[in-house]
Amino acid sequence: MNTEKVYILEDRGILYINGPDSEKFLQNLISNDIEKVNESKSCFASLLSPQGKFLFDFIVVKHKDGYLLDCEKRIVDQLYKKLVTYKLRSDVEILNLSNEFVVAAFNHEKFLSIEGAKDELGYTTKYNEDHVLLDPRNKKLGGRIIANLEKLYMSLKKMKLKSSNIEEYYKLSFELGIPQSNMDQLQEKLFGIECNFVELNAIDFKKGCYVGQENTSRIKNKDKLNKRLLPLQVKKGSIRSEEHTSE
């Protein structure tokens, strides 16, 4: 990822979970430990079905007295509705701020050049009062900034970053085995642990109960996966017979 490039991810949506019960509310639902998340630490997490199947994944960022969920925009309304069904009597407010906030990704080295930044997965700081963090899944995905649309371009200009084709970013992501697009096609088809969520730091096996925790722990204890998401590269051409004929 070039140090001068930035990828404005307009296909990302933002939910804001706020209120006195916001921490407890998320802790009882998501696969990661919300207590890890603070002003200097963000995390990757998922919301699973009661059977432990994949439903949604997102990055959790501390924001004021609540939390921002950075997720794929095409399923942000689904995630919003699912969270509302779990709300019950919890004193929380769930807002869809996708029209107010924008997410952008940029180079790992560029992130480290920001004052106060640390080379730690999920490390979070502020730049021009906006949240900037090192992607909690893989450092090669670089830094992320979550900002109000008007302020975003001011921050990017100040950082001397030029907008580039987001396909470059997603190509890198897929090569790393981290799909971020059309995730609704995986819903209810794979267990969360089969989506490489352990390797991507999305599951905390030491935290208490959450939705789908029982099957997730059972599969982990068996230490055997029947399926797993992997990147696949398709090349043009034909295979010569001598390349696949054994003696």
Could you say what each language-model-derived stretch is?
Residues 1-242, 246:
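Basic, glycine/lysine-rich polyanion-binding surfaces/domains
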